[in-house]
Amino acid sequence: MTKIETLVERARRLKEKGLTTEEIADELNVSRETALWLITRVGETPPSDIYVEWRELTKPSRLRLVAMAMADMIVSEVKEDIEVVVGIATSGIPLAAMVAEELGCEFTIYYPRKFKTDEEKPKGGILSENFARVSGKKCAIVDDITSTGRSIKEAIEVIEANDGKAVCAAVIVNKRGGNEIEGIPLLSMLKILRI
């Protein structure tokens, strides 16, 4: 089975489990357009995208090392003390919790708009009320991969709407390019650039 066939099969299984196209895209670390193509196979060739397989890093001992490196990157690049690490659901949560522990600060979760029903989407994403509050605090946003930057942009807006200050975003893989989102630094352990 080729990598594309494997992705098509994974997308099909996720769809059968009831996941939306956006949730499948998040689970497979591909764009929404690519996830839709994997499900429907409309058109001969897939959209231009880069698939990132980072499953080997998700073993807790390995993820801890990634979190240590990410925390070090944040401390090196950001001159302000981080008070809250905001993990973007779902794949950014475990990494963000470990980064918060490394930085010795609080942790919370941001649920992006893409995980809401169509009627809930106009209200935007939300910060969890079960974890730290961001009001009056300097925040670092953490996710595994950014493709468009949409979830990070939403998180910045929600943090600011809750009287917090987003001072940076950090990801393992940056598929979108660029070094900032909404005026804050976008720190990337790996940046993928098309030539």
Curated annotation (Swiss-Prot):
GO terms for molecular function: DNA binding; orotate phosphoribosyltransferase activity. Keywords: DNA-binding, Transcription, Transcription regulation. The keyword Transcription regulation applies. The keyword Hydrolase does not apply. One of its GO terms (biological process) is regulation of gene expression. InterPro entries: GfcR-like, PRibTrfase_dom, PRTase-like. It holds the Pfam family Pribosyltran. Contains an N-terminal DNA-binding winged helix-turn-helix domain and a C-terminal regulatory domain (or effector binding domain) resembling phosphoribosyltransferase (PRT) domain. Belongs to the purine/pyrimidine phosphoribosyltransferase family. GfcR subfamily. This is Transcriptional regulator GfcR. It comes from Archaeoglobus fulgidus (strain ATCC 49558 / DSM 4304 / JCM 9628 / NBRC 100126 / VC-16). The lineage of its organism: Archaea, Methanobacteriati, Methanobacteriota, Archaeoglobi, Archaeoglobales. The gene is gfcR.
